[in-house]
Regions:
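Short, membrane-interfacial amphipathic segments enriched in basic
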Residues: 1-8, 166
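Alpha-helical transmembrane segments of integral membrane proteins
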Residues: 2-5, 20-24, 69-73, 150-158
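Hydrophobic alpha-helical transmembrane segments of multi-pass membrane transport/permease proteins
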Residues: 14-47, 67-86, 126-129
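Short hydrophobic alpha-helical segments within the ABC transporter permease transmembrane module
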Residues: 27, 100, 113-122
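Perimembrane loop-to-helix junctions flanking transmembrane segments
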Residues: 48-63
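Hydrophobic alpha-helical transmembrane segments of membrane proteins
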Residues: 62-93, 158-171
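Transmembrane helix boundary and interhelical loop/hinge segments in multi-pass membrane proteins
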Residues: 84-108
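Alpha-helical transmembrane segments and their short interhelical loops
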Residues: 110, 118-177
Length: 178
């Protein structure tokens, strides 16, 4: 287990050392939330208000909160998948740089090497998507907060599941090409 943790730590350090990869993975959720809030929010709000009969009145705060929740849900779904692919580039770079050859002659099983890649992808993705989660909560708070603590915890749990799914998917696809 110590070997897996050492490989995980190595991959985490490489991810944070590569400023381009770090910047790209962190800026992606920020760009998406700005684009969603700028362009899609009005479209979503118009479609919500058009679907509500005239005899029913719903407060703007509730409609804005619902629209913000829809936008942040789609942002988190996209971000949790795309960020994991960006984070998992360490595995691809190791193959391109020849570092994998060094790992192959080391007295470490392939399972431990792949587990180290996978766990570091999960940890790094959770950090980046955690930042996106906080930004989304801030956007929800600004637009119309309606969630309680249990709702926030369920959304956090959903984010963790999405990161695990994205990490598994990106690891499988990276293994196919290695």
């Amino acid at each position: 287990m110590r070997t897996v943790l050492a490989l995980m730590d190595r991959n985490r350090k490489l991810f944070f050392k590569d400023k381009g990869m770090l910047f790209t993975s962190m800026i992606t959720p920020v760009i998406l939330i700005v684009l969603y809030a700028t362009f899609l929010a009005k479209v979503f709000k118009d479609s919500f208000t058009a679907a509500i009969p005239d005899m029913i009145t719903i407060s703007d705060k509730l409609i804005n909160g619902t629209v913000a929740a829809q936008l942040t849900a789609s942002l988190m779904a996209v971000s949790c998948i795309t960020v994991t692919f960006c984070v998992n580039l360490t595995m691809v770079q190791d193959k391109a740089n020849g570092t994998r050859k060094d790992f192959n002659v080391a007295p470490v099983s392939k399972e431990k090497i792949y587990l180290g890649y996978f766990l570091s992808t999960v940890a790094n993705s959770l950090m980046v998507n955690g930042l996106a989660f906080v930004l989304c909560l801030g956007y929800l708070f600004k637009m119309g907060w309606y969630m309680n603590t249990a709702d926030v915890l369920w959304v956090l749990f959903d984010m963790i599941l999405l990161v695990l799914f994205g990490s598994t998917l990106s690891s499988i696809l990276s293994l196919i090409h290695i």
